[in-house]
Amino acid sequence: MSGDILVGEYLFKRLEQLGVKSILGVPGDFNLALLDLIEKVGDEKFRWVGNTNELNGAYAADGYARVNGLSAIVTTFGVGELSAINGVAGSYAEHVPVVHIVGMPSTKVQDTGALLHHTLGDGDFRTFMDMFKKVSAYSIMIDNGNDAAEKIDEALSICYKKARPVYIGIPSDAGYFKASSSNLGKRLKLEEDTNDPAVEQEVINHISEMVVNAKKPVILIDACAVRHRVVPEVHELIKLTHFPTYVTPMGKSAIDETSQFFDGVYVGSISDPEVKDRIESTDLLLSIGALKSDFNTGSFSYHLSQKNAVEFHSDHMRIRYALYPNVAMKYILRKLLKVLDASMCHSKAAPTIGYNIKPKHAEGYSSNEITHCWFWPKFSEFLKPRDVLITETGTANFGVLDCRFPKDVTAISQVLWGSIGYSVGAMFGAVLAVHDSKEPDRRTILVVGDGSLQLTITEISTCIRHNLKPIIFIINNDGYTIERLIHGLHASYNEINTKWGYQQIPKFFGAAENHFRTYCVKTPTDVEKLFSDKEFANADVIQVVELVMPMLDAPRVLVEQAKLTSKINKQ
């Protein structure tokens, strides 16, 4: 494939080659001409899917990328892109590959320094691009066609390999500049550079020796094992060694939780006591993809000895106190699978503790109330293999730790960035990615609190517009629970308008009769009846469930985390 091609057409064709089917975002005067080029890709499944606002679009791009592996969002210069920056920053923090395309004023207008609308009135057209440099792995503006293809390829390659957002600014005339199409016939380089053989062998030798000498080895899986695509290697490592394996909150769904070797969730000092004792007494910790944020570690309360630790990261390794830069964990894991002796590993593998939390009624509440310690273990029974589950910052993010997932569930949350309202936009991106995938029958399930819902509810409208069919659980507990637990238990600033008619949401947003179902559950009996309803479980239309829970009830881990956070905030 050679000859000339329009810059915008080249960009969209490359995205289509990388598996992106839907372009998210909001139209604006500086990106309209660029959007006209989407149809030139030539694939009827490659399309524009607009969002209700740019922030929701950025959240949706995050959710789409977590299911699909990559996503793209188009915004307009200044007002549009800054509306999206919170969502893009979240993707940067959480290692999610999002291509952010910004329609900018034309190159000719930029050269004049005109006081154009959507600017700060200072003639500087790179101000917003400079802002995004802090939350992007790579930033470029296409100002000519000569090297446009190479710049676009570099940006897309970095986005994928670094698993972080990139920024591509395209002036309104630049999308129609002519570029070479010759690269379209070549596959983008998406693999990490191979490790230095001598350094790699030294790392392998050290790890092998530690495994031989270990008596109580364990494996701990975290977020970056998922983000940097080593889950297949991790599964093979668990299968080979039989070592007890744990996940962090951000590592939920990284491994098969039906495995006999899955042993629970580690959250530092607020972990289940048996999990805490088992992992903190290890003499060999294989930590894969760690992202040690406060909510992911029980406010940094890990009690693990560095002298017993091997840390696997996307671009470096740490063995005990020695750092090995520029050593990619993917290749180390593949090499380990070849050199470790299975029978030797099996002889060191202790039996798991049988991690399985049962539903129980919370102290101080009636058995007719739906409490978190009852609901989340029961919710595990409702989940099916291959479900996509999105949980909101707050009670849902912590409650889901009490679920033991079926095989191949994809869990999406935002534990590090923690922007409330994220989950609704991410749900739309996720259900759209499922629709675009080879498995469009997978269920997409959202659990969101009433307070968070009020920030981003309009993206449910976009689901209805495109006939997407998520199951949406709304926790109706009268306001901001996590904030109340941290500070201001009865403060007015943690209150919201509690008079919303949740049963009216689909109809209000235009869902046709017989194309939606709504439910309100107030007791455990209501929940059990709903979960046994085959029509509900089939998810053949969009469904909204109002889940009424006590105002101050919360998952155990959240209660403990809130105490730690409150203490830190007062330091």
UniProtKB/Swiss-Prot annotation:
Transmembrane segment boundaries: none
Catalytic activity: a 2-oxocarboxylate + H(+) = an aldehyde + CO2; pyruvate + H(+) = acetaldehyde + CO2
Binding site residues for Mg(2+): D450, N477, G479
One protein family per Pfam: TPP_enzyme_C
Origin superkingdom: Eukaryota
Cofactor requirements of the protein: Mg(2+); thiamine diphosphate
Residues at which pyruvate binds: D29, H118, E483
Keyword Magnesium applies: yes
GO biological process, one term: aromatic amino acid family catabolic process to alcohol via Ehrlich pathway
Enzyme Commission designation: 4.1.1.1
InterPro entries: DHS-like_NAD/FAD-binding_dom, PDC/IPDC-like, THDP-binding, Thiamin_PyroP_enz_cen_dom, Thiamin_PyroP_enz_TPP-bd_dom, TPP_enzyme_TPP-bd, TPP_PDC_IPDC, TPP_PYR_PDC_IPDC-like
Magnesium keyword on record: yes
Positions annotated to bind thiamine diphosphate: T395, G418, S419, I420, G451, S452, N477, D478, G479, Y480, T481, I482
Cofactor, free-text remark: Binds 1 Mg(2+) per subunit. Binds 1 thiamine pyrophosphate per subunit.
Subunit structure: Homotetramer.
Family: Belongs to the TPP enzyme family.
Protein name: Putative pyruvate decarboxylase C13A11.06
Organism, scientific name: Schizosaccharomyces pombe (strain 972 / ATCC 24843) (Fission yeast)
